[in-house]
């Protein structure tokens, strides 16, 4: 029996994701211990049960069929993103959800998976090379299509996740250093511009030198450098066109202390909660910041505060360790499967989870602006939990069929 399980199930991915889900349920219960939010825990429990069904279904899904439907599934997800723009429910300024009674479904969560599958299907073709500008352009189009629709909602946080996933797949696909730098440079210039003229000029100078040293063609290098500069200069115009709540999130990221009772409140309280946990924490259901509701809706964006405050460094480190086990195993799986398609899918799904973890915990620690990115397996949210379960199921499927070409 044990040998059968080891042959067909990746225990490291399975156990780590199971433990993270349990920690998530425990944390959501604590964060919603107040009777006013008591139904949230039971909803999350119901989504966990549904997630188990989704995980099993994806783990048993015919492997060959998975690749066959990759592009059609991606096209269907694009259709859903268009429909949600027209008929979806607007929450916190974003038209991202379909209402299903007392539950809401967010199509962009599932579009992440179909985008990974579609991009993996394209990159695994024998006639595709990322050193060919045409192939690179088409690969970028697969990612930019859903990103453009998501930005129209607008949902910047979800759109950012696609960037991390796409970068990992392009890197895994053998893109040159210059190509990778071409992807990073505009983003670096944009971030530098947010901090002011001097940081922007420093980024432009450093990236300019790197672009020159890695250039494959002078004209292309000049175009990349120009795009980087234009993106950086355009940031201020984009900022001026943002909605007030989006501007506040960026301002809070740059200086949380400037408005400690307003826009910066959540980040400051989050840092207090995590920092006050000490080594072993204050005890379950005894966190002052979490139990006294100092952090609004802490069961979503700031769920990491709960284990950090109530179980201290040990609790926070345990969560990080479990994520490390999951992510390292995902990369290992990507390097060991025989199929090129399976390898791309594994690295794409792993990178998607990794980007979520990196940004969410960065938000909780005040290292990133609050952009509404949930912590996988822990944060409250049905769409997020179902998509996480689907990703685990697909990884299990790849492990079972790891010797297939």
PLM region spans:
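Transmembrane helix boundary and interhelical junction motifs in multipass membrane proteins
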Residues: 155-160, 282-287, 298-300, 371, ...
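A juxtamembrane structural motif centered on a specific transmembrane helix
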Residues: 1, 360-405
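Proline- and acidic/polar-enriched loop/turn elements at helix boundaries
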Residues: 32, 182, 285-286, 320, ...
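TM-adjacent membrane-interface loops and short helices in multi-pass inner/ER membrane proteins
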Residues: 252-300, 311-315
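N-terminal membrane topogenic signal
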Residues: 1-18
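Helix-boundary and loop/linker segments of multi-pass membrane transporters
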Residues: 5-6, 136, 292-295, 337-338
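Hydrophobic alpha-helical transmembrane segments of multi-pass inner membrane proteins, especially
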Residues: 14-30, 34-262, 305, 309-365, ...
